[in-house]
Amino acid sequence: MYFQSIVMNVADLDRSLEFYDEVFGFKLLARQDQLAAIHAPGSERPQVIVMRSLGTSSSRVGGAGHVGMRAFVLDCGSLNELERIATELDHRHSLVTRRDGDTWTAAFGRDPDRTAVVAGCSLDPDQSITLEAWAQLDEFLYGVAE
């Protein structure tokens, strides 16, 4: 089993498309009215985010206070890619913090709708973040959208 797609509601579709392109390199696959699909180019398997614009509303609450996605977590292919993402988040004043585990390092930020975005990377350049690393329940990760 692997990540194929997620669907997320956004307030401003254009703003979100720009953010996910410039920060993570996701490219537009399709767009129709207030719906868009973006993908991670270069991936061996399709990885798609489908975004639906809900528009702005003062009653809409972002982050962990709404039903929907709490955090979007990516495993970067290299420490250089992680540094590029962290720099872009910082440039946008969206970087919340950096965090290191025993076998990984990560940058925690927020997208334009205040959803938590996390880019992580294994400290071993020959492997992804392991299942064992996920078994070490890091309170910061699970509380990131609080």
Model regions and ranges:
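Vicinal oxygen chelate
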Residues: Y2-A11, R60-E146
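Short amphipathic alpha-helices in soluble, non-transmembrane regions
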Residues: D21-V23, I85-D90
